[in-house]
Amino acid sequence: MSGSAAIMKAPAKSEFIIKPENTKAEVDTSNWPGLLKNYDKMLIRTSHFTPIPDHGSAPWSRDIKSYVSSGVINLDKPSNPSSHEVVAWIKRILRVDKTGHSGTLDPKVTGCLIVCIDRATRLVKAQQGAGKEYVCCIRFHDTVPGGEPAFAKALETLTGALFQRPPLISAVKRQLRIRTIHKSRLLEFDNERHLGVFWVSCEAGTYIRTLCVHLGLLLGVGAHMQELRRVRSGVMSEDDGSLVTLHDVLDAQWQYDNNGDEALLRKVIQPLETLLCTYKRLVVKDTAVNAVCYGAKLMIPGLLRYDQGIEQGEEVVLMTTKGEAIAIAIAQMGAVELATCDHGCVAKVKRCIMERDLYPRRWGMGPVASEKKKLKASGLLDKYGRPNEKTPASWLQSYKDYNVSSSEAPALPAPAGADAAAAPSTPALPAPEEKNESEEKSADASDSKKRKKDETAEEKAERKRLKKEKKEKKEKKKSDKDE
């Protein structure tokens, strides 16, 4: 072997040792559906909880009956029928109890109309106040001086907070109101045909018809709305692949009724959780879910995770670890307090969405609640859990009922070892005379009849005459109506 030949060295032993690491593989949740999207980016309050796998299910895994009754449809409303007619047709096709929509569209207007079914109708109010986007075709009454640049400038001018009065033919009172135009963009313009097409993103309740009239006034030629289409309502738009027609809904229900195929029905209907993706989230332990459904406040021990940037007084959505929406709530703490506090109220329920008893009851099973049950069973507390003369002093000192204010709290019973000699030697005052119950009732009755007793005979006769005339007039009116 020549000296220039490379000599392989034995590698150090340490290079083959796998060292222990205090890390774990990260899960990419950016593609998870609904409320579970970016779950790994939420801040962790605690990771310890008792899962209840036999109750509840992921929104996309519900049985078909629950799926339909907790669903929403992003419907492409056809021209001519009113929004109420369309919603009534959906109700009849799907054979459900309740339906509602996210905001009325005029009969001639087409586009996104979010139809909520049964449980999802609880979200209708929130969706009616969500932002909207429209594409509008405007017809000018004459050639626009300045052409396309003038039209684009007028659109830019009519951006921001605007005064609007509803059109002459409208379902609301014609009061002056302020509505905000967030953005607008010119799409097409034909000055020879006196037509223009523009896109607008605006606040709920904005009248595009009124906006077209204002554009005509600003350009000095007059204008009116020719056609209108809503392209986005809240979080749902015509580009996200969820837009369906009435024929699609009818076909999906027919397939399920005749062939038992629910695939098309699941494609047409979306879970209600899709409407809540813009809310900040609070993840609730499975054991606390049913208490929240019964109206309880969410407390710190029931919180698992929370989104960044939550502020006090903000609307948030309470969700389970499976991605189900429990309720819309008002946050009582900000994100900083949620990270540092060890007790307190996290959120108060504003609108409950989930049905009661979908998850089992888990309240009243802690050490304090168990002790309270024992005391009630042995007669040391009354049937409502309030202290009585037999209540031990240790319980009175340690237990605080947060549902009762300090002014309403019952007086604590005197300890058993209290000595009569400890009382001051002042002479006992005579007890005030107690009124009999029957005497109080008779006094109330006499007060109510005081007016009749004080009146003279002439006043009494006049009162009776007026009463008789009123009665005869009423009977005559009734008989005329029957004829």
Curated annotation (Swiss-Prot):
Pfam family, one: TruB_N
Organism whose genome encodes this protein: Chaetomium thermophilum (strain DSM 1495 / CBS 144.50 / IMI 039719) (Thermochaetoides thermophila)
Subcellular location: Nucleus, Nucleolus
Catalyses which reaction(s): uridine in 5S rRNA = pseudouridine in 5S rRNA; uridine in snRNA = pseudouridine in snRNA; a uridine in mRNA = a pseudouridine in mRNA
Region (Disordered): 406-483
Protein name: H/ACA ribonucleoprotein complex subunit CBF5
Listed GO biological process terms: box H/ACA sno(s)RNA 3'-end processing; cell division; mRNA pseudouridine synthesis; rRNA pseudouridine synthesis; snRNA pseudouridine synthesis
Subunit composition and interactions: Component of the small nucleolar ribonucleoprotein particles containing H/ACA-type snoRNAs (H/ACA snoRNPs).
Keywords for this protein: Cell cycle, Cell division, DNA-binding, Isomerase, Microtubule, Mitosis, Nucleus, Repeat, Ribonucleoprotein, Ribosome biogenesis, RNA-binding, rRNA processing
Gene Ontology MF annotations: DNA binding; RNA binding; snRNA pseudouridine synthase activity
Job description of the protein: Catalytic subunit of H/ACA small nucleolar ribonucleoprotein (H/ACA snoRNP) complex, which catalyzes pseudouridylation of rRNA. This involves the isomerization of uridine such that the ribose is subsequently attached to C5, instead of the normal N1. Pseudouridine ('psi') residues may serve to stabilize the conformation of rRNAs and play a central role in ribosomal RNA processing. The H/ACA snoRNP complex also mediates pseudouridylation of other types of RNAs. Catalyzes pseudouridylation at position 93 in U2 snRNA.
PROSITE patterns: PUA (PS50890)
Compositionally biased tracts (Basic residues): 463-476
Matches recorded under SMART domains: DKCLD (SM01136), PUA (SM00359)
Biased composition (Low complexity): 409-428
Similarity remark: Belongs to the pseudouridine synthase TruB family.
Superkingdom to which the source organism belongs: Eukaryota
Comp. bias (Basic and acidic residues): 432-462
Domain PUA, first and last residues per copy: 279-354
A Gene Ontology term for the protein's cellular component: box H/ACA snoRNP complex
